[in-house]
């Protein structure tokens, strides 16, 4: 734990002793080990030949949905919307295995109708980032970059900012590797500079 947590535990232990509460553990103490894993991204950056992009300014990602990573890539593949559906696939005849892939959010529309649903209702490909992340994972993508048109709005929202900058703590026994390839959400400006 942190220094503050240790001090709080010491204080509680002393208060229990002063109050006459008998120790609960076989070792004569009041506390048991409770191993935790903390996910937190701090000062994350992405560098290109001419630019340095910063977490919470140019991009964001979900700490629990990504592994710690460091990549070097000669190029980034732009792959439309990153959809891999029987009705529409950006992955068809494209080798993206081991590559960094950049995609647009949303889905293709023709005359105000989704190519996938055939109506003005959007498909699951537009509603849940995990669907595109799963497609990227199954196609061997090394890292998925999604252009988020709402990035500035999200990063200027105090609740979102606190959530994205904060840490995620889980019991060590519940820890599991993220099920998707690493994925980040980037600004249009960052996308323009990367391509």
Where in this protein do the model-derived segments appear?
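BRCT (BRCA1 C-terminal) domain core and associated BRCT-interaction motifs
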Residues: 34-43, 152-162, 187
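Noncatalytic luminal/extracellular "stalk/propeptide" segments of secretory-pathway proteins
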Residues: 1-113
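Structured catalytic/translocation cores of nucleotide/phosphate-coupled proteins
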Residues: 1, 128, 175-179
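Extracytoplasmic/secreted proteins, especially bacterial periplasmic and envelope-associated proteins
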Residues: 3-18, 29, 128-135, 140, ...
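Hydrophobic alpha-helical scaffolding
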Residues: 2, 122, 180-184
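Long, well-ordered, tryptophan-enriched scaffold segments
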Residues: 138, 142-152, 163, 169-195
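A conserved hydrophobic secondary-structure block that centers on an alpha-helix together
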Residues: 75-160
């Amino acid at each position: 734990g942190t220094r503050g947590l240790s001090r709080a535990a010491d204080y509680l232990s002393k208060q229990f002793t002063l109050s006459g509460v008998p120790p609960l553990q076989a070792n004569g103490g009041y506390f048991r080990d409770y191993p935790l894993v903390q996910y937190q991204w701090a000062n994350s950056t992405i560098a290109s030949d001419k630019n340095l992009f910063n977490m919470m300014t140019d991009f964001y990602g979900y700490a629990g949905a990504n592994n710690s990573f460091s990549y070097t890539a000669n190029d980034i593949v732009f792959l439309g919307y990153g959809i891999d559906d029987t009705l529409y696939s950006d992955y068809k005849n494209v080798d993206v295995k081991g590559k960094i892939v950049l995609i647009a959010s949303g889905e293709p529309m023709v005359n105000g109708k989704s190519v996938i649903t055939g109506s003005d209702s959007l498909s699951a490909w537009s509603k849940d980032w995990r669907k595109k992340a799963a497609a990227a994972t199954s196609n061997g993508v090394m890292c998925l970059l999604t252009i988020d048109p709402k990035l500035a709005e999200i990063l200027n929202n105090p609740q979102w900012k606190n959530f994205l900058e904060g840490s995620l703590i889980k019991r060590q026994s519940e820890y599991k590797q993220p099920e998707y390839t690493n994925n980040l959400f980037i600004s249009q400006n960052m996308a323009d500079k990367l391509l």
